[in-house]
């Protein structure tokens, strides 16, 4: 470029000015890609057996990685005993949208579950779709860890948008997808119901393995029902008829 260098200094050399890329403009830049680009430039000025050996090593490693392998195929599935096995099911004539977490696997389990959202965006895609489809209501899956992290904002957005949606909060007290760590922060089922009620959720139902373990003074928000897990299908059919945002804590 004129004026870019001091008088008497070597002229600058532009690489890629005519569409010949030194490095790929898109995708991943691996150490091997960068090493080959540097070696190609150096080879114009200096020939080295060491450089040739290192390039041959990189070629051999990548060829080994690219070699086809025969392996048994196993589709991922929920762990035995995980509540997601049941909680991600919806009535046959209903639909659900997926989110971040192990429950994402319900997308390929024939459970009328589609789409993927980022963490904290569960159900938000429905806010844009709802006004352009004949479908009145959907379910949205959300884990308890996601809820505490950022999922509550998605529910708040749904309340503000006045759409018909039922969030299924899949409470398993663990971040199972990354090793079973406990969920950060204090987050009990009664606390969740009080927070949701304060956000303007129309109706909240808790499905518990043993509803009797929750006494009357457990601290649930007013009007919250606690029912057995066996009522899942019936409760979902009730909630989908309720206008506005509803929540099922499973």
Sequence positions of predicted segments:
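Cofactor-pocket helix-loop regions in the catalytic cores of large enzyme subunits
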Residues: 42, 46-109, 149
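Terminal amphipathic helices with adjacent charged low-complexity linkers/tails
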Residues: 1-53
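Gly-rich Lys/Arg/Thr-decorated short loops/hinges at beta-loop-alpha junctions or inter-strand turns
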Residues: 14-17, 66-75, 103-112, 135, ...
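General beta-strand structural signal in soluble alpha/beta enzymes
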Residues: 14-17, 53, 96-99, 140-141, ...
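Hydrophobic alpha-helical scaffolding
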Residues: 1, 16-32, 72, 77-84, ...
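Conserved active-site and cofactor/substrate-binding residues in soluble primary-metabolism enzymes
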Residues: 25-37, 74-77, 82-89, 120-124, ...
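Thiamine diphosphate
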Residues: 85-89, 95-177, 184-190
